[in-house]
């Protein structure tokens, strides 16, 4: 769903006597999505001595009491004159919400689905890379997993990725935190990129980006 709450529209500025004039003076409401989109991507270093040929993600868990049981459909009201420039529209009407008390459990990723690449670090987001360019590159070259749509929350999103270096091996885990920072966790692409370096060490990189 998409929405926006706009106030102080000067109706007189958008009135015309002709159809052509009306087109030039139309009212444009910049809508935003009411949810965010969470992606996971995984890659592993190639090479005979990389020791990543058997790694796999066994499960992913996002902590309990992170997401409200309900959230506002509309972001905060905003003046028409400034709404179009605000790409971080959000709702601050949290009050004291109740939160989902259970873990969000996501599937693991088998070894065959973890992209083998020469340099996993090359798939971190570049300093000048736009959000859309990065998403296009990751979807094309790495491939995403466990796409999830999330309610807006005023909390950081925390969780763990569990993995094994070999079939039947010890299950290890790595924590991640996607910060809220008071900004919109609505209308956002939330990306967690996990990559296995030489020896099987799992490193994580995460991004909060505009959802174009």
Regions found by a protein language model. Give the residues of each.
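Short helix/strand-capping turn motifs
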Residues: 1-11
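Tryptophan-paired
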Residues: 16-25, 30-32, 37-188, 208-211
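Intrinsically disordered, low-complexity repeat and linker tracts
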Residues: 189-212
């Amino acid at each position: 769903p998409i929405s926006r709450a706009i106030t102080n529209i000067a109706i007189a500025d958008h009135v015309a006597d002709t159809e052509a004039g009306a087109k030039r003076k139309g009212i444009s409401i910049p809508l935003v999505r009411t949810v965010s989109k969470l992606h996971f991507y995984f890659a592993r270093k190639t090479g005979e001595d990389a020791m990543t040929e058997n790694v796999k993600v066994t499960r992913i868990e996002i902590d309990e009491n992170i997401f409200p049981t309900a959230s506002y459909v509309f972001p905060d009201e905003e003046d028409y004159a400034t709404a179009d420039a605000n790409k971080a529209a959000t709702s601050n009407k949290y009050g004291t919400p109740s939160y989902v008390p259970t873990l969000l459990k996501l599937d693991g990723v088998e070894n065959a689905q973890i992209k083998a690449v020469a340099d996993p670090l090359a798939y971190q987001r570049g300093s000048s890379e736009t959000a859309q360019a990065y998403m296009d590159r990751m979807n094309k070259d790495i491939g995403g997993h466990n796409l999830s749509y999330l309610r807006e929350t005023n909390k950081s999103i925390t969780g763990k990725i569990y993995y094994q270096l070999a079939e039947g091996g010890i299950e290890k885990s790595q924590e991640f935190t996607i910060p809220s920072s008071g900004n919109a966790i609505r209308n956002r692409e939330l990306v967690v990129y996990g990559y296995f370096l030489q020896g099987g060490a799992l490193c994580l990189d995460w991004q909060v980006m505009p959802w174009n």
